[in-house]
Amino acid sequence: MAISSRSVGMTEIHCNFPQNPFRRISRRISQFRAGFPDKKPAAGACEEQDELTSGSAARIQRRDKQLPEIIGSDRELMSKLTTLGRPYRHFPFMGNRHVETIFASFFRSWPVIKSRRECLRMEDGGTVELDWPLEGEDAELWNGELPVNSPVLILLPGLTGGSDDSYVKHMLLRARKHGWHSVVFNSRGCADSPVTTPQFYSASFTKDLCQVVKHVAVRFSESNIYAVGWSLGANILVRYLGEVAGNCPLSGAVSLCNPFNLVIADEDFHKGLGFNNVYDKALARGLRQIFPKHTRLFEGIEGEYNIPTVAKARSVRDFDGGLTRVSFGFQSVGDYYSNSSSSLSIKYVQTSLLCIQASNDPIAPSRGIPWEDIKENPNCLLVVTPNGGHLGWVAGDDAPFGAPWTDPLVMEYLEVLEKNQIEKPLRRTIDDVHTPRVDSVHTRETNNYKSPIENVN
Protein backbone atom coordinates (compact mmCIF):
# COMPACT_ATOMS: atom_id res chain seq x y z
CA MET A 1 0.00 0.00 0.00
CA ALA A 2 1.22 3.44 -0.63
CA ILE A 3 -0.17 6.90 -0.30
CA SER A 4 0.00 9.44 -3.07
CA SER A 5 1.37 12.89 -2.32
CA ARG A 6 -2.08 14.38 -2.93
CA SER A 7 -3.70 12.27 -0.21
CA VAL A 8 -1.59 13.89 2.51
CA GLY A 9 -1.65 17.43 1.19
CA MET A 10 1.84 17.48 -0.24
CA THR A 11 3.00 18.72 -3.62
CA GLU A 12 2.71 16.06 -6.29
CA ILE A 13 6.03 14.60 -7.32
CA HIS A 14 6.63 13.30 -10.81
CA CYS A 15 9.86 11.35 -10.68
CA ASN A 16 11.07 10.59 -14.18
CA PHE A 17 14.76 10.53 -13.31
CA PRO A 18 17.15 9.91 -16.22
CA GLN A 19 19.78 8.50 -13.88
CA ASN A 20 19.90 6.75 -10.54
CA PRO A 21 21.70 9.11 -8.12
CA PHE A 22 22.03 6.42 -5.45
CA ARG A 23 23.48 3.65 -7.58
CA ARG A 24 27.05 4.65 -6.75
CA ILE A 25 26.24 4.51 -3.03
CA SER A 26 24.61 1.11 -3.48
CA ARG A 27 27.65 -0.18 -5.38
CA ARG A 28 30.00 1.02 -2.64
CA ILE A 29 27.90 -0.71 0.02
CA SER A 30 27.86 -3.92 -2.03
CA GLN A 31 31.65 -3.77 -2.40
CA PHE A 32 31.99 -3.22 1.33
CA ARG A 33 29.78 -6.23 2.09
CA ALA A 34 31.65 -8.38 -0.42
CA GLY A 35 34.80 -7.96 1.64
CA PHE A 36 33.36 -10.12 4.39
CA PRO A 37 32.88 -13.88 4.06
CA ASP A 38 29.45 -15.39 4.62
CA LYS A 39 28.82 -16.81 8.06
CA LYS A 40 29.28 -20.53 8.34
CA PRO A 41 26.01 -22.43 8.27
CA ALA A 42 24.90 -24.17 11.41
CA ALA A 43 25.66 -27.86 11.71
CA GLY A 44 23.44 -29.86 9.43
CA ALA A 45 22.41 -26.87 7.35
CA CYS A 46 22.56 -27.09 3.59
CA GLU A 47 22.49 -24.66 0.73
CA GLU A 48 18.91 -25.52 -0.08
CA GLN A 49 16.39 -27.52 1.91
CA ASP A 50 13.25 -29.03 0.36
CA GLU A 51 10.37 -30.15 2.52
CA LEU A 52 8.04 -32.32 0.43
CA THR A 53 4.40 -32.65 1.31
CA SER A 54 2.12 -35.52 0.36
CA GLY A 55 1.05 -33.47 -2.66
CA SER A 56 4.65 -33.43 -3.92
CA ALA A 57 4.82 -29.67 -3.52
CA ALA A 58 8.17 -28.28 -2.48
CA ARG A 59 8.65 -25.62 0.17
CA ILE A 60 12.10 -24.29 -0.52
CA GLN A 61 13.73 -22.49 2.40
CA ARG A 62 17.21 -21.28 1.60
CA ARG A 63 20.07 -20.50 3.93
CA ASP A 64 20.51 -17.11 2.26
CA LYS A 65 17.97 -14.94 4.05
CA GLN A 66 17.81 -12.64 1.02
CA LEU A 67 16.40 -15.31 -1.28
CA PRO A 68 12.61 -15.61 -1.52
CA GLU A 69 10.74 -18.56 -0.10
CA ILE A 70 9.13 -20.64 -2.85
CA ILE A 71 6.24 -23.09 -2.72
CA GLY A 72 5.21 -25.05 -5.79
CA SER A 73 5.10 -28.53 -7.29
CA ASP A 74 5.83 -27.75 -10.95
CA ARG A 75 9.60 -28.20 -10.89
CA GLU A 76 9.86 -27.98 -14.68
CA LEU A 77 8.22 -24.56 -14.62
CA MET A 78 10.36 -23.36 -11.71
CA SER A 79 13.52 -24.48 -13.49
CA LYS A 80 12.68 -22.11 -16.35
CA LEU A 81 12.24 -19.10 -14.07
CA THR A 82 15.79 -17.81 -13.78
CA THR A 83 14.65 -14.75 -11.83
CA LEU A 84 13.59 -17.00 -8.95
CA GLY A 85 17.27 -17.36 -8.10
CA ARG A 86 17.72 -13.61 -7.62
CA PRO A 87 18.18 -12.53 -4.01
CA TYR A 88 15.92 -9.80 -2.70
CA ARG A 89 18.35 -7.11 -1.58
CA HIS A 90 16.36 -4.04 -0.73
CA PHE A 91 17.81 -0.66 -1.61
CA PRO A 92 19.89 0.88 1.22
CA PHE A 93 17.77 2.19 4.12
CA MET A 94 14.66 0.42 2.76
CA GLY A 95 14.59 -2.46 5.23
CA ASN A 96 11.56 -1.14 7.10
CA ARG A 97 8.20 -2.19 5.65
CA HIS A 98 6.65 1.24 6.04
CA VAL A 99 9.63 3.04 4.53
CA GLU A 100 9.59 0.75 1.49
CA THR A 101 5.82 1.04 1.08
CA ILE A 102 5.67 4.82 1.33
CA PHE A 103 8.86 5.49 -0.63
CA ALA A 104 7.57 3.50 -3.59
CA SER A 105 4.32 5.45 -3.58
CA PHE A 106 5.89 8.88 -3.43
CA PHE A 107 9.08 8.46 -5.43
CA ARG A 108 8.54 5.69 -7.98
CA SER A 109 8.54 7.28 -11.44
CA TRP A 110 5.37 7.81 -13.48
CA PRO A 111 6.00 6.96 -17.14
CA VAL A 112 3.98 9.17 -19.48
CA ILE A 113 1.53 7.01 -21.43
CA LYS A 114 -1.35 8.08 -23.66
CA SER A 115 -4.24 5.66 -23.85
CA ARG A 116 -7.50 5.03 -25.67
CA ARG A 117 -10.35 4.64 -23.20
CA GLU A 118 -13.29 2.32 -23.82
CA CYS A 119 -16.38 2.85 -21.71
CA LEU A 120 -18.18 -0.48 -21.26
CA ARG A 121 -21.77 -0.88 -20.10
CA MET A 122 -22.24 -3.96 -17.93
CA GLU A 123 -25.24 -6.27 -17.88
CA ASP A 124 -26.75 -4.53 -14.82
CA GLY A 125 -26.26 -1.04 -16.28
CA GLY A 126 -23.03 -0.36 -14.41
CA THR A 127 -19.99 1.12 -16.14
CA VAL A 128 -16.31 0.20 -16.21
CA GLU A 129 -13.57 1.64 -18.37
CA LEU A 130 -10.65 0.02 -20.15
CA ASP A 131 -7.47 1.96 -20.95
CA TRP A 132 -5.50 0.66 -23.94
CA PRO A 133 -2.02 2.26 -24.15
CA LEU A 134 -1.29 4.02 -27.44
CA GLU A 135 2.06 5.70 -27.03
CA GLY A 136 4.52 7.00 -24.48
CA GLU A 137 7.75 8.91 -23.95
CA ASP A 138 9.77 6.16 -25.64
CA ALA A 139 8.42 6.68 -29.17
CA GLU A 140 10.27 3.76 -30.76
CA LEU A 141 8.69 1.38 -28.27
CA TRP A 142 5.16 2.27 -29.31
CA ASN A 143 5.49 3.00 -33.03
CA GLY A 144 5.43 -0.56 -34.36
CA GLU A 145 2.22 -2.52 -34.67
CA LEU A 146 2.05 -5.76 -32.70
CA PRO A 147 0.93 -8.96 -34.45
CA VAL A 148 -2.79 -9.59 -34.12
CA ASN A 149 -2.15 -12.84 -32.25
CA SER A 150 0.22 -11.34 -29.67
CA PRO A 151 -0.79 -12.27 -26.10
CA VAL A 152 -2.97 -9.85 -24.14
CA LEU A 153 -2.48 -8.83 -20.51
CA ILE A 154 -5.38 -7.49 -18.41
CA LEU A 155 -4.26 -5.43 -15.39
CA LEU A 156 -6.36 -5.10 -12.21
CA PRO A 157 -5.14 -2.29 -9.88
CA GLY A 158 -5.72 -2.09 -6.13
CA LEU A 159 -8.43 -0.30 -4.14
CA THR A 160 -9.43 3.00 -5.82
CA GLY A 161 -6.51 2.46 -8.22
CA GLY A 162 -6.40 2.64 -11.98
CA SER A 163 -4.25 3.19 -15.04
CA ASP A 164 -2.66 6.25 -13.39
CA ASP A 165 -0.86 4.25 -10.71
CA SER A 166 2.91 4.05 -11.15
CA TYR A 167 3.18 0.27 -10.65
CA VAL A 168 0.52 -0.22 -13.35
CA LYS A 169 2.34 2.04 -15.80
CA HIS A 170 5.62 0.21 -15.31
CA MET A 171 3.91 -3.09 -16.09
CA LEU A 172 2.35 -1.57 -19.22
CA LEU A 173 5.82 -0.57 -20.40
CA ARG A 174 7.34 -3.97 -19.66
CA ALA A 175 4.52 -5.81 -21.42
CA ARG A 176 4.97 -3.65 -24.51
CA LYS A 177 8.73 -4.26 -24.54
CA HIS A 178 8.00 -7.98 -24.61
CA GLY A 179 5.58 -7.59 -27.50
CA TRP A 180 2.37 -7.99 -25.51
CA HIS A 181 -0.91 -6.12 -25.83
CA SER A 182 -2.10 -4.80 -22.48
CA VAL A 183 -5.16 -3.10 -21.03
CA VAL A 184 -6.04 -1.65 -17.63
CA PHE A 185 -9.40 -2.58 -16.12
CA ASN A 186 -10.63 0.48 -14.18
CA SER A 187 -13.41 -0.61 -11.83
CA ARG A 188 -16.58 1.37 -11.20
CA GLY A 189 -15.74 4.83 -9.90
CA CYS A 190 -11.96 4.38 -10.24
CA ALA A 191 -9.65 6.53 -12.39
CA ASP A 192 -12.56 8.80 -13.35
CA SER A 193 -14.81 5.91 -14.38
CA PRO A 194 -18.46 6.93 -13.97
CA VAL A 195 -20.81 5.21 -11.55
CA THR A 196 -24.18 4.66 -13.23
CA THR A 197 -25.89 2.36 -10.70
CA PRO A 198 -26.09 2.51 -6.87
CA GLN A 199 -23.27 0.00 -6.61
CA PHE A 200 -19.49 0.35 -6.66
CA TYR A 201 -17.40 -2.83 -6.55
CA SER A 202 -16.29 -5.21 -3.84
CA ALA A 203 -13.56 -7.69 -2.92
CA SER A 204 -15.68 -10.60 -4.16
CA PHE A 205 -17.64 -9.07 -7.06
CA THR A 206 -16.37 -10.83 -10.19
CA LYS A 207 -19.19 -10.25 -12.70
CA ASP A 208 -17.53 -7.16 -14.17
CA LEU A 209 -14.25 -9.05 -14.63
CA CYS A 210 -16.10 -11.91 -16.34
CA GLN A 211 -17.55 -9.48 -18.87
CA VAL A 212 -14.26 -7.63 -19.38
CA VAL A 213 -12.49 -10.93 -20.11
CA LYS A 214 -15.23 -11.79 -22.60
CA HIS A 215 -14.89 -8.39 -24.30
CA VAL A 216 -11.11 -8.78 -24.63
CA ALA A 217 -11.43 -12.39 -25.81
CA VAL A 218 -13.87 -11.40 -28.55
CA ARG A 219 -11.61 -8.59 -29.70
CA PHE A 220 -8.46 -10.75 -29.67
CA SER A 221 -9.89 -14.08 -30.74
CA GLU A 222 -6.49 -15.38 -31.89
CA SER A 223 -4.57 -14.44 -28.75
CA ASN A 224 -3.99 -16.03 -25.37
CA ILE A 225 -5.20 -13.83 -22.54
CA TYR A 226 -3.57 -13.38 -19.12
CA ALA A 227 -4.23 -11.20 -16.09
CA VAL A 228 -2.24 -9.53 -13.31
CA GLY A 229 -3.86 -8.19 -10.15
CA TRP A 230 -2.48 -6.10 -7.31
CA SER A 231 -3.80 -6.15 -3.74
CA LEU A 232 -7.62 -5.90 -3.83
CA GLY A 233 -7.41 -6.45 -7.60
CA ALA A 234 -5.47 -9.64 -6.85
CA ASN A 235 -8.15 -10.80 -4.42
CA ILE A 236 -10.84 -10.25 -7.07
CA LEU A 237 -8.73 -12.04 -9.69
CA VAL A 238 -8.14 -15.13 -7.53
CA ARG A 239 -11.83 -15.21 -6.57
CA TYR A 240 -12.66 -15.19 -10.28
CA LEU A 241 -10.19 -17.99 -11.04
CA GLY A 242 -11.71 -20.14 -8.32
CA GLU A 243 -15.27 -19.48 -9.44
CA VAL A 244 -14.71 -20.36 -13.10
CA ALA A 245 -12.34 -23.21 -12.17
CA GLY A 246 -11.84 -25.47 -15.21
CA ASN A 247 -13.83 -23.16 -17.50
CA CYS A 248 -11.40 -20.25 -17.21
CA PRO A 249 -10.65 -18.51 -20.53
CA LEU A 250 -7.38 -17.10 -19.15
CA SER A 251 -4.12 -18.88 -19.96
CA GLY A 252 -2.43 -17.72 -16.77
CA ALA A 253 -2.52 -15.13 -14.00
CA VAL A 254 -0.37 -13.35 -11.41
CA SER A 255 -1.44 -12.13 -7.96
CA LEU A 256 0.68 -9.58 -6.07
CA CYS A 257 0.26 -8.50 -2.43
CA ASN A 258 -3.07 -10.27 -2.18
CA PRO A 259 -4.61 -9.85 1.30
CA PHE A 260 -6.10 -13.38 0.83
CA ASN A 261 -7.82 -13.52 4.24
CA LEU A 262 -9.69 -10.24 4.67
CA VAL A 263 -10.60 -10.98 8.29
CA ILE A 264 -6.94 -11.37 9.25
CA ALA A 265 -5.97 -8.36 7.14
CA ASP A 266 -8.63 -6.27 8.91
CA GLU A 267 -7.45 -7.46 12.33
CA ASP A 268 -3.82 -6.57 11.61
CA PHE A 269 -4.86 -3.34 9.96
CA HIS A 270 -6.40 -2.05 13.19
CA LYS A 271 -3.72 -3.12 15.64
CA GLY A 272 -2.29 -0.12 17.43
CA LEU A 273 -2.23 3.49 16.28
CA GLY A 274 0.86 3.45 14.07
CA PHE A 275 1.30 3.61 10.32
CA ASN A 276 -1.62 1.27 9.66
CA ASN A 277 -3.92 3.91 11.09
CA VAL A 278 -2.44 6.39 8.62
CA TYR A 279 -2.99 3.96 5.75
CA ASP A 280 -6.58 3.33 6.83
CA LYS A 281 -7.42 7.03 6.91
CA ALA A 282 -5.74 7.60 3.56
CA LEU A 283 -7.69 4.74 1.97
CA ALA A 284 -10.93 6.03 3.44
CA ARG A 285 -10.18 9.46 2.06
CA GLY A 286 -9.71 7.95 -1.40
CA LEU A 287 -13.10 6.26 -1.16
CA ARG A 288 -14.74 9.44 0.14
CA GLN A 289 -13.41 11.38 -2.82
CA ILE A 290 -15.13 8.99 -5.21
CA PHE A 291 -18.48 8.90 -3.41
CA PRO A 292 -19.65 12.58 -3.50
CA LYS A 293 -19.80 12.56 -7.30
CA HIS A 294 -22.46 9.86 -7.18
CA THR A 295 -24.56 10.58 -4.06
CA ARG A 296 -27.65 11.28 -6.18
CA LEU A 297 -27.77 7.57 -7.07
CA PHE A 298 -28.41 6.76 -3.41
CA GLU A 299 -31.07 9.39 -2.71
CA GLY A 300 -34.17 7.74 -1.29
CA ILE A 301 -32.69 4.27 -1.67
CA GLU A 302 -34.15 1.57 0.58
CA GLY A 303 -32.16 -0.77 2.77
CA GLU A 304 -29.56 -0.48 5.51
CA TYR A 305 -27.41 2.09 3.73
CA ASN A 306 -25.81 4.63 6.05
CA ILE A 307 -24.99 7.44 3.66
CA PRO A 308 -23.95 10.01 6.33
CA THR A 309 -21.36 7.52 7.68
CA VAL A 310 -20.10 6.79 4.18
CA ALA A 311 -19.76 10.49 3.35
CA LYS A 312 -17.64 11.03 6.47
CA ALA A 313 -15.93 7.63 6.60
CA ARG A 314 -12.73 7.72 8.64
CA SER A 315 -11.83 4.13 7.84
CA VAL A 316 -12.36 1.55 5.12
CA ARG A 317 -14.49 -0.38 7.59
CA ASP A 318 -16.82 2.63 7.94
CA PHE A 319 -17.25 2.78 4.17
CA ASP A 320 -17.77 -0.97 3.82
CA GLY A 321 -20.27 -1.03 6.68
CA GLY A 322 -22.35 1.84 5.36
CA LEU A 323 -22.28 0.97 1.67
CA THR A 324 -20.30 -1.98 0.29
CA ARG A 325 -21.69 -4.80 2.42
CA VAL A 326 -25.26 -3.49 1.93
CA SER A 327 -24.90 -3.21 -1.86
CA PHE A 328 -23.79 -6.82 -2.12
CA GLY A 329 -26.21 -8.33 0.40
CA PHE A 330 -23.94 -9.11 3.35
CA GLN A 331 -25.33 -9.04 6.89
CA SER A 332 -22.36 -7.24 8.42
CA VAL A 333 -18.84 -6.08 7.67
CA GLY A 334 -17.51 -9.25 9.27
CA ASP A 335 -19.80 -11.32 7.06
CA TYR A 336 -18.55 -9.41 4.01
CA TYR A 337 -14.87 -9.91 4.86
CA SER A 338 -15.14 -13.57 5.82
CA ASN A 339 -17.07 -14.48 2.67
CA SER A 340 -15.04 -12.35 0.23
CA SER A 341 -11.57 -13.69 1.00
CA SER A 342 -9.73 -15.25 -1.94
CA SER A 343 -8.16 -17.74 0.47
CA LEU A 344 -11.47 -19.59 0.13
CA SER A 345 -11.01 -19.86 -3.65
CA ILE A 346 -7.37 -20.87 -4.08
CA LYS A 347 -8.08 -24.61 -3.82
CA TYR A 348 -10.43 -24.42 -6.81
CA VAL A 349 -8.03 -22.60 -9.15
CA GLN A 350 -7.25 -24.67 -12.26
CA THR A 351 -5.36 -21.94 -14.14
CA SER A 352 -1.60 -21.43 -13.81
CA LEU A 353 -1.23 -18.85 -11.04
CA LEU A 354 1.81 -17.10 -9.60
CA CYS A 355 1.32 -15.46 -6.19
CA ILE A 356 3.98 -13.02 -4.98
CA GLN A 357 3.87 -11.75 -1.41
CA ALA A 358 6.20 -9.81 0.91
CA SER A 359 6.68 -11.33 4.35
CA ASN A 360 6.61 -7.88 5.98
CA ASP A 361 3.57 -6.52 4.11
CA PRO A 362 1.65 -4.21 6.51
CA ILE A 363 -1.63 -4.56 4.57
CA ALA A 364 -1.54 -8.16 3.32
CA PRO A 365 -0.02 -10.01 6.31
CA SER A 366 1.82 -13.24 5.64
CA ARG A 367 -0.22 -15.07 8.28
CA GLY A 368 -3.21 -14.70 5.97
CA ILE A 369 -1.55 -16.61 3.12
CA PRO A 370 -3.30 -19.98 2.53
CA TRP A 371 0.00 -21.89 2.62
CA GLU A 372 -1.44 -25.41 2.71
CA ASP A 373 -4.02 -24.86 -0.02
CA ILE A 374 -1.34 -23.39 -2.29
CA LYS A 375 1.01 -26.32 -1.60
CA GLU A 376 -1.73 -28.80 -2.45
CA ASN A 377 -2.76 -27.06 -5.69
CA PRO A 378 -0.41 -28.07 -8.55
CA ASN A 379 -1.48 -25.01 -10.55
CA CYS A 380 -0.17 -22.52 -7.99
CA LEU A 381 3.30 -21.14 -7.35
CA LEU A 382 3.96 -18.93 -4.32
CA VAL A 383 6.97 -16.63 -3.92
CA VAL A 384 7.44 -14.78 -0.62
CA THR A 385 10.17 -12.15 -0.44
CA PRO A 386 11.81 -11.33 2.91
CA ASN A 387 11.00 -7.64 2.50
CA GLY A 388 8.99 -5.47 0.14
CA GLY A 389 6.27 -3.78 2.15
CA HIS A 390 2.94 -3.38 0.38
CA LEU A 391 3.65 -3.10 -3.35
CA GLY A 392 6.95 -1.44 -2.59
CA TRP A 393 9.65 -3.94 -3.56
CA VAL A 394 12.26 -1.21 -3.89
CA ALA A 395 15.05 -3.51 -5.04
CA GLY A 396 16.69 -4.79 -8.19
CA ASP A 397 18.32 -3.10 -11.16
CA ASP A 398 15.70 -0.34 -11.41
CA ALA A 399 15.72 0.68 -7.73
CA PRO A 400 14.97 3.02 -6.19
CA PHE A 401 12.86 5.03 -8.66
CA GLY A 402 12.07 2.51 -11.37
CA ALA A 403 9.99 -0.64 -11.69
CA PRO A 404 9.57 -2.89 -8.64
CA TRP A 405 11.71 -5.99 -8.10
CA THR A 406 8.76 -8.22 -9.00
CA ASP A 407 8.20 -7.01 -12.58
CA PRO A 408 10.93 -9.11 -14.28
CA LEU A 409 9.68 -12.24 -12.48
CA VAL A 410 6.07 -11.55 -13.46
CA MET A 411 6.96 -11.09 -17.11
CA GLU A 412 9.27 -14.11 -17.22
CA TYR A 413 6.54 -16.29 -15.72
CA LEU A 414 4.00 -15.08 -18.29
CA GLU A 415 6.46 -15.59 -21.15
CA VAL A 416 7.09 -19.18 -20.04
CA LEU A 417 3.34 -19.84 -19.94
CA GLU A 418 2.85 -18.29 -23.36
CA LYS A 419 5.62 -20.40 -24.84
CA ASN A 420 3.91 -23.50 -23.46
CA GLN A 421 0.58 -22.36 -24.91
CA ILE A 422 1.76 -21.87 -28.50
CA GLU A 423 1.26 -25.52 -29.40
CA LYS A 424 -2.13 -25.76 -27.69
CA PRO A 425 -5.54 -24.74 -29.07
CA LEU A 426 -7.24 -21.73 -27.50
CA ARG A 427 -9.99 -22.39 -24.95
CA ARG A 428 -12.87 -19.96 -24.90
CA THR A 429 -15.60 -21.20 -22.55
CA ILE A 430 -17.40 -17.87 -22.17
CA ASP A 431 -20.45 -18.20 -24.38
CA ASP A 432 -22.80 -17.80 -21.42
CA VAL A 433 -21.22 -14.50 -20.32
CA HIS A 434 -22.88 -11.21 -21.23
CA THR A 435 -21.00 -9.20 -23.88
CA PRO A 436 -20.73 -5.59 -22.64
CA ARG A 437 -21.70 -2.72 -24.91
CA VAL A 438 -19.08 -0.11 -25.84
CA ASP A 439 -20.65 3.24 -24.93
CA SER A 440 -17.79 5.51 -25.98
CA VAL A 441 -14.13 5.64 -26.98
CA HIS A 442 -11.74 8.56 -26.46
CA THR A 443 -8.05 9.30 -26.05
CA ARG A 444 -6.75 10.07 -22.57
CA GLU A 445 -3.49 11.35 -21.12
CA THR A 446 -3.12 9.16 -18.04
CA ASN A 447 -0.73 11.58 -16.31
CA ASN A 448 -3.40 14.25 -15.96
CA TYR A 449 -5.00 12.47 -13.01
CA LYS A 450 -3.50 10.85 -9.94
CA SER A 451 -5.46 8.50 -7.72
CA PRO A 452 -5.59 9.83 -4.16
CA ILE A 453 -4.39 6.45 -2.92
CA GLU A 454 -1.80 4.31 -4.65
CA ASN A 455 -0.60 0.75 -4.26
CA VAL A 456 -3.27 -0.11 -1.75
CA ASN A 457 -5.61 -2.96 -1.00
From Swiss-Prot:
Keywords: Hydrolase, Serine esterase. Residues 151-391 form the AB hydrolase-1 domain. Residues 39-59, 438-457 are annotated as: Disordered. Residues 438-447 have a biased composition (Basic and acidic residues). Its EC number is 3.1.1.-. One of its GO terms (molecular function) is monoacylglycerol lipase activity. The active site is at residues 231, 361, 390. The keyword Hydrolase applies. Residues 448-457 have a biased composition (Polar residues). It is an enzyme of class 3 (hydrolase). It comes from the Eukaryota. Gene3D superfamilies: alpha/beta hydrolase. The keyword Hydrolase applies. InterPro entries: AB_hydrolase_1 (IPR000073), AB_hydrolase_4_CS (IPR000952), AB_hydrolase_4_sf (IPR050960), AB_hydrolase_fold (IPR029058), ABHD4 (IPR012020). Disulfide bonds: none annotated. Belongs to the AB hydrolase superfamily. AB hydrolase 4 family. This is Embryogenesis-associated protein EMB8.
